[in-house]
C-alpha cells in the first residue's frame, strides 16, 4: 500500500466533522496516543515566578487585632478610615498593586506585625 499524502488530505477535506472525530478516536486507540495539546512544563512557571518584578500585596485575613491592621492599611495606602476599614473587612483584598519586591515585603512585614495574614501575588 503506497502512502499518498495528497490523496489523504483530499479525503479529509471532504469528510464531515463527525467522521473526522471518529478517525481521531480510532487513531488514538490504535496507536495509544492522545490528540490533546501538550501543556507547558512546570519548570517554566517557576522561572516566571522568580523573574517577577511587580507584586500585589493581598490581605488574606485581618486576624484578631483588626484595629491595628486598619491603622496599618491606612498608613500604607493614604486612604481614609472608612475606606481602610472596608478593605480590611472585605478580606481577602488587595491593599496595594504593582509594588517592587522590597516595598511589597516591607508592607507585608508591617501588616503582619499588626496581626494580619498577608500574601504577595
Swiss-Prot record:
Disulfide pairings: none
NCBIfam families: L12
Free-text function comment from the UniProt entry: Forms part of the ribosomal stalk which helps the ribosome interact with GTP-bound translation factors. Is thus essential for accurate translation.
Record protein name field: Large ribosomal subunit protein bL12
InterPro entries recorded: Ribosomal_bL12 (IPR000206), Ribosomal_bL12_C (IPR013823), Ribosomal_bL12_C/ClpS-like (IPR014719), Ribosomal_bL12_oligo (IPR008932), Ribosomal_bL12_oligo_N_sf (IPR036235)
Gene Ontology molecular function, alphabetical: mRNA binding; structural constituent of ribosome
Organismal lineage: Bacteria, Bacillati, Bacillota, Bacilli, Lactobacillales
SUPFAM superfamilies on file: ClpS-like, Ribosomal protein L7/12, oligomerisation (N-terminal) domain
Origin: domain of life: Bacteria
Family: Belongs to the bacterial ribosomal protein bL12 family.
Pfam families assigned: Ribosomal_L12, Ribosomal_L12_N
HAMAP family, A to Z: Ribosomal_bL12
Keyword Amino-acid biosynthesis: no
Keywords: Ribonucleoprotein, Ribosomal protein
Keyword Transport: no
Species for this entry: Oenococcus oeni (strain ATCC BAA-331 / PSU-1)
Quaternary organization: Homodimer. Part of the ribosomal stalk of the 50S ribosomal subunit. Forms a multimeric L10(L12)X complex, where L10 forms an elongated spine to which 2 to 4 L12 dimers bind in a sequential fashion. Binds GTP-bound translation factors.
BP GO annotations: translation
GO cellular component, one term: cytosolic large ribosomal subunit
